[in-house]
């Protein structure tokens, strides 16, 4: 069976690559939904344009970001947090597309996390040279829900570390359509992305799009 024909509803032939207890890569899981996903990505970006956020320390992030769902993750001089209203537009974030919620729930279930219902999706655009430093996802209220991360476009090297920043990180090459899920004992592991290498993807050109689904309920300001 080819990746293009793979139906994520049928997990009998799913290629699963374990990373740690409660963490794994679902190889090619999203590829059969790529057309719908990319159309919805473009619609969200059209409504809430990508932007380069500033860290609390005043540094400009190399990755461009936007959000959809009830909550959106933002960063500025005030810190990291989830908000209901896009601070640049003064309006709620776009609704999360049905294709997003379906994929996130299916991927989480395939990784052993039943009943996952994300209320936040962070859309990251990586262009060559963009990276994401090692960090933990700690701004959510309930660490019992997993993280679901979908890769589209150019390949990237994903870093998956331990419970401390100094722990040695595994390096895993992620391809178009791969989905990483981590939760349970791995929920607070450090993770990041090495600088994106130059390249050209048939559908997305010289970029990588990452969709990160979280349950962030009550982590509001």
Regions found by a protein language model. Give the residues of each.
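Non-heme Fe(II) oxygenase metal-center motifs and adjacent flexible, charged/small-residue loops
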Residues: 1-221
